[in-house]
Amino acid sequence: MDRASENRRLAAVGKPVPGIGEMGNRRPLRDINNLVGAPPHPSAIAKKPMLEKSGKEEQKPALVVSHRPMTRNFAASLTRKEQLDHQVSVADAAVVCTDPQKNPIPDGTVDDDVESCESNDYIAVDECNDTDEDESMMDIDSADSGNPLAATEYVEELYKFYRENEEMSCVQPDYMSSQGDINEKMRAILIDWLIEVHHKFELMDETLFLTVNIVDRFLEKQVVPRKKLQLVGVTAMLLACKYEEVAVPVVEDLVLISDRAYTKGQILEMEKLILNTLQFNMSVPTPYVFMRRFLKAAQSDKQLQLLSFFILELSLVEYQMLKYRPSLLAAAAVYTAQCALTRCQQWTKTCELHSRYTGEQLLECSRMMVDFHQKAGAGKLTGVHRKYSTFKFGCAAKTEPALFLLESGAGGYNLQKHLQQAC
């Protein structure tokens, strides 16, 4: 296409021009705005001839070219640049991919990488078998090394002391036989009511477990008539609050919560009697002390914590659970909760190390807890179930119980290995 025909097409845009002949000798277009008579866009191309004439260097920063025209010369330069870049990239790739030191693999030989791949399956199996051994070396206190309240330097000595002294918090599993006017069913009604009172006052977990411990230790040593059984429970909670809580409920609130069945004076008199009977010994290891440690060893989340405490509080109501030590109750609660959530028997080497119990030792107690879990919503004593059916406690009571533990039979611990592999 000649220049005249090009000028004839471009002249149709914008204002009419005087004539084709007048534009025949003009220089090739550098800016299409020159054609329509509008002021040219600020661009480096428009200013370049001025810089060449003046011979001075431009002091201002270069303007961004936002409306550069696509002329034939400019398009050709872009095409040449792309071809050169492509040739350079191909050459670089050839240099990188070429390894002059590496010889081709002769026929009948196998590369070392291929041989290692064939043995990966066996290595993976060995690693799975050694998982439990590696877990026994896990340091569960390393994350709290900078926390002075965690007392990581003395935590093992503390729990050694708790295990040595947990017998002090235990009672005879048949102490109710010495009571003439009350029985184990009345005790269950009292504990279920105390759990509701504890929830109503929004007290700490430590307070509840210490309250139940005070009640059992006092009833073991003191014969109590039926009419004063609730008084013993209210006073035990008052003592536990004084030992554990920052803000203690006033005695008048306890009078109201018991429907004014007792006076303030009666509560204070019972407080003296309990303290003298127990010789002011309020510092005893409860299941709560061990529960926190075992949950940490199990690397628990919020769901496991709530379900473990739900199962443990169900055990507080049951008189038959007094035959177990506090540490075993806590370990069995965590074990049962893990089984309910994972749907298989799970008890790691780390949990065994810190609890001092194996899965076989926990199985008997765990089966009883599964039965309590299954029947928690039925009957008259449903205080724990209602408490853990709320959103505040994660609706833990609605979790399906680990019924397969009841079906495992006497060889349950041997079955555990097969269930772990299935999981």
From Swiss-Prot:
Pfam families: Cyclin_C (PF02984), Cyclin_N (PF00134). Keywords: Cell cycle, Cell division, Cyclin, Mitosis. InterPro entries: Cyclin, Cyclin-like_dom, Cyclin-like_sf, Cyclin_A/B-like, Cyclin_C-dom, Cyclin_N, Cyclins_cyclin-box. GO terms for molecular function: cyclin-dependent protein serine/threonine kinase regulator activity. Residues 1-61 are annotated as: Disordered. One of its GO terms (biological process) is mitotic cell cycle phase transition. May be involved in rapid internodal growth of deepwater rice under submergence. Interacts with CDKB2-1. Belongs to the cyclin family. Cyclin AB subfamily. Involved in the control of the cell cycle at the G2/M (mitosis) transition. May activate CDKB2-1 kinase. This is Cyclin-B2-1. It comes from Oryza sativa subsp. indica (Rice).
